[in-house]
């Protein structure tokens, strides 16, 4: 089966980044602590998908984003994913917990479940340092 496309949003506040704890009833990666993400619909532009997913999951309207990296990931249910990760640099609204079990600001990468999310944050931090 071909990998599906997903978009990942990285929202930073000071030295902290926004993470979510996925609900236990989710078929993909239940209960993990991860960056907010979602599937790209067929024919949908990646940036449009990110805007839609962040509105659905967090209730925010993304105004500006910067591409960080593309990752390959195999989810707990075996789904293969190409994850397009973006740092969200400007948005309207306050993040709300709409689809996850909870959302919170985290500053310790070790508290995140997925190594791929940890590496994505590191890549984003290196990009920031090189500019």
What spans do the regions from the language model cover?
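Conserved N-terminal beta-strand and adjoining loop/helix that marks the start
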Residues: 1-18, 36-39
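A conserved beta-turn-beta hairpin within the catalytic core of GNAT-like acetyltransferases
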Residues: 26-31
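Active-site-adjacent beta-strand/loop module that shapes the phosphate/pyrophosphate-binding cleft
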Residues: 61, 71-94, 108
